[in-house]
């Protein structure tokens, strides 16, 4: 008899495919799409899904646009998400994947790529977008916004409380990389308070002294487990 603990927790997309065994995955929100790094992975794993990709940085969005043109069923948007709608400063780095609505923290780890630039960018709330787009079910919500994950979740209160989001994949920072960043404790309390189960950490990155810098976390709504039998251990 195979041990499931030996196969879960290794590949976050493979695990998502195993958790979401009910309705076919048809809607993926890629928040913090940057230059489109996740597009091909999502498309290969979930071929029937429409991917909605969001990127507020003008320069990164132009690269995202080119990447999306090569992938079917992708819709792109030149704005990001926060706890309120409006124009806000986006802190810009030489490496666009480090851009954040937050300023750099005391343990910001890229001295050669400081967040020393700013650009005005548009932000919306996730609740507004879902209402505007008429989306009633989100299979995968991916959030990678460099420390601002809690701002996105605060703007998604209605979506989280109404159980229209089946799973959430998001990045969590453990060092003080960004000023006012969401913590594991805050994110855990927020999502478990809305009925989500924490299922694992993936793609962990450590600094030279062994401290965990950041990783991806996966939360699945408890409703996805409603018809599954309780585990039986020897």
Identify the residue ranges that each predicted region occupies.
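Phosphate/nucleotide-binding beta-alpha loop and adjacent structural elements of enzyme active sites
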Residues: 1-234
